[in-house]
Amino acid sequence: MAEPAEPIDLNAADITALDSLPGIGPATARAIIEERTRRGGFRSTRDLLRVPGIGEGRFARLKDRVRV
């Protein structure tokens, strides 16, 4: 999939938008949505670090491609 030109809003993105991010597949996209739902939304992009499978390295690749 092509990378989006604008950062993706973590609080509004659907599974397809999240799956378009580098290093994020369908399972991780679902985990992001589950964490977002559980927390009532993300307050910071660093909240992605609470998602299973997203560590500092993966977050470093994503941080400029996402927003809240």
Regions from the language model: what does each represent?
Residues 35-36:
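Residue-level signature of tetratricopeptide-repeat
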Residues 49-53:
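Short, exposed beta-strand-loop hairpins at the edges of beta-sheets
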Residues 1-8:
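N-terminal, intrinsically disordered low-complexity tails/presequences enriched in Lys/Ser/Pro
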Residues 32:
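Conserved hydrophobic/aromatic packing and binding residues within compact polymer-binding modules
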Residues 67-68:
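Short, solvent-exposed mixed-charge patches
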